[in-house]
Each structure stands twice: as C-alpha cells, then as structure tokens.
Amino acid sequence: MSKTYRYFCRQFLNAGLLFVGSTLLASAQDADYQLDPAQTSVKFTLDDVLHSVHGTFKLKQGHLEVESDGKMSGQIVVDATSGDSGSGMRDRKMNKEVLESARYPEISFRPDRIEGPVAGSGKSSVMIHGMFNIHGADQEITVPAQVETDADHWTAAVHFTVPYQKWGMKNPSTLFLRVSDTVEIDLIAAGTVARHTAQSTQ
C-alpha cells in the first residue's frame, strides 16, 4: 500500500469522523421551537355510520423547549371554542354538550420528554410523551411525530386518537345516528427554531 493511498484513506476517514461528530453535536443541542398559529393546523375526524365529519380547531399559542438529554417543556394551547365542522348546529352541540367549552375553553398538551434525536437538518421520527388536557382533565399520552427542520424553521406532523367518551365526555349519538366514541386528531405544526449550546448561552 503506497504512502499516497494511506494518506488519502486517513483524510477520508478524518472527514467522515468530522461529519459524524458535527451531526451528533447538532442533534445534541438544546432547541426552542415556536409554533406559528398562521402556519399550524389542528384537524379532527369523527366517524359515524353514514360518513366522516371533518373539522378544525385554532391554535392559540405554542412554545416547546427540547434539551439535549431528551427533556421537554412548554405547551401547545388550542382554542376549544373554535371547533368548526362546517355545520353551525353541530358545532354548537359539540361546544355545549361534548367539550363544554364555555367551562373548559382550552385544550392543551404539555410535553415532558422526547424519545429519539431530532436532526439539525432534515427529517426525524420521534415519540413525544406528555400530558394532554381536555375537558378539564389531564391524560397521559405518547404520540409519534414526524419532524423536519432546517436552519431556522421546523414542521411536525402528529396523529393520535382521543377516546373522548372514555375520558368523561358525552357521546353525541342519537337514536338514529351513532357516532364513534373516539376522534382522530391531526396536528401539522410549523414555526421557527432557535438552537443554542452551552457556549452560546454564557
């Protein structure tokens, strides 16, 4: 093996180690994630025997902090009174009889840990654990999230099921129309991200 060949092998190996090291360092950084209400959507789907009802809620605010050891803090707050399924009568019934949104005007999620690294750039698949508060009660959940980040922007897609009847809310079924006792939630979050290391916070 020639000296030139060995030299190029060492250079290639060093470059690879440098790339891996910088990637691990980026993923280990603490990060603050802001949710932009204008770019974030909260959709729900409720099935009945005839069709599926689709609707939306509005995000009030959202801020998440992710530490390099996987700890999370912050919260996502949704306006429970903003539910819109395209039917005023159905929405009034949902607010009055199911969500009781006059009494419980907010739905929130307070994460406490994340499982899996979030890449400094590109796509990541993680699991997020925390407390989901709806109808005035905390429920422990773990949800999958597909996260994509670049230099200063991020998006995340989250899907999970809310067993609302099991969690103490009224099932709006009638004698002639039976609906599911669970509702599907799809959150598409987007906003800005700021990363910081120990050196940058001094």
Stretch-by-stretch model annotation:
Residues 2-16:
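Bacterial N-terminal signal peptides that target proteins for export
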Residues 28-202:
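Low-complexity, acidic/polar, glycine-enriched regions of mature
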Residues 21-25:
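N-terminal signal peptide c-region/cleavage motif recognized by signal peptidases
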Residues 13, 18-20, 47, 54:
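Residues at the start of alpha-helices and the adjacent loop-to-helix junctions
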